[in-house]
Amino acid sequence: FSYFDEHYDNLPEVICLLKGNMIGRHCSREFFEQVYDNKTFTFLYDEKQYWDRFSKYNENKEKNEIGTTFLAMENVYVEKNNSWYVDSPNHPKKYFNDVDDLLRFIYKDPMIPQYCMFSPGACFIVRREQISKHSREFYRNLNKIMNYAMDPSFPSEAHQIERILPIIFTSLCEVNDWMDDEAAFEAKLPECSAYIQYKWENRPRRFKKLRKMLGLI
């Protein structure tokens, strides 16, 4: 979001949000060449090799079982909102346990979705008015949520924000006041770390009574 911050007053009408490895990993060159000149909000994602698994019917015309992931259309990936990735040791979390907590921190009264509709890799074509619906401070604060460390890799919060980008760019929900105020945000964010620690210390554990008796906890 640094580009949004640095060029907030003179953003181009349409922006492509890309990754260096997008072509070949998240979409084909053929797909990108067909859509790169779009002037509307576009998911830059296209993996036809998964159509057979994620569509309603497979190549044998048999109905697929509904799983935790599927395609809403050819370039819109949908994933059950279970934040399965947050316990990865390669992407540790500091502020938010899951997408639900993140949405509640950003918005005053968010609708918590059962599924997240997003573009894997966070690659989109987005319009200026979608970006400017939020303040410059809003994007600075989002950066603080997901760019605080690379130990050993980017944090879990980056995965979480990847999944809510369509919400950020399209939702009409009102954001919390601290999202538009850097000082208030920096005063509020440590509460999230304390909450993470509390939930970890009070997480359900097997054989808790036995462990306590043995002096292990």
Name what the model sees in each region.
Residues F1-I217:
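ER/Golgi luminal nucleotide-sugar-dependent glycosyltransferases, focusing on the catalytic module
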